């Protein structure tokens, strides 16, 4: 078994690292210069074929500001390299008539008889959302979920509601050992207008399935800043967010990595 981590080094391209045992370290970065864009994500099919999906410019001429595309490459697992040329599988986004913007953050899954492509759309501000498509093969043809978006806080909600959570999107899905599906995504808690001191928070919500499509949150339903604890297997480590107690004697030569977080204090 091999573990992979792929990401964007802004201004320098996209790369991945791999490991047989993440606890013992990772390979040197392996750059993928064929990827022209951001947000790369791996998918490895049951037959061993690898794929990379990512955000990139549309093929040909851009028709409006904010129009982007989702591209797919085949990936050679043995050669650690991309095979051939990309294929544009989403152009602009879903429901293209109103000119959707900033389709990005793609993830590819194989669930049942379909391949699912889940993407963020609308930018990471107040119009942020998550949309999904499905196809019989990773190369398509892709069918949009008629009920997109499957997660958003942009419409049908009062801006004066208490404990406002906004800008929800950039999600990923995982199935637990008990068979339940969960989604993690980012959202923000503004204290006024579009200002927030905590940046982007990470949220967890259950995923429900209907007619072969996943839904993270009903349209018009507000995200609660506090949810019920998920009945998932604990990893035995003390949490470092939310309400928690943690003791550190600081008797080692190096600071525990648990103290690395957004906006570290200078002392």
Locations of regions flagged by a protein language model:
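Carbohydrate-active catalytic/glycan-binding domains of CAZyme proteins
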Residues: 1-267
